[in-house]
Amino acid sequence: MKWEPEIPRWKQVYAVMSERVVDGTYPPGERLPSAMAICDEFGISQVTAKRVLTELRQAGLAYMEPGIGTFASPLPEAPNS
């Protein structure tokens, strides 16, 4: 990944991970990569990876099952126009 120096890394990784939830790469109910797997994929610290997972949960894009992991949340249906 090419890093933008003026944007915090957690925000850049969050943007990638949230896009994967929205575009269905991680379908609803699928377990997201662990903090360690995110560290390995993006070359970031575990603290940064945990921040990304926390932000995904706070945004409603993921939920945690204690002792199991973090999972992609079902996305709201788009209103019919």
What spans do the regions from the language model cover?
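Extreme N-terminal segment that seeds HTH/winged-HTH DNA-binding domains in transcriptional regulators
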Residues: 1-54, 58-63, 68, 74-81
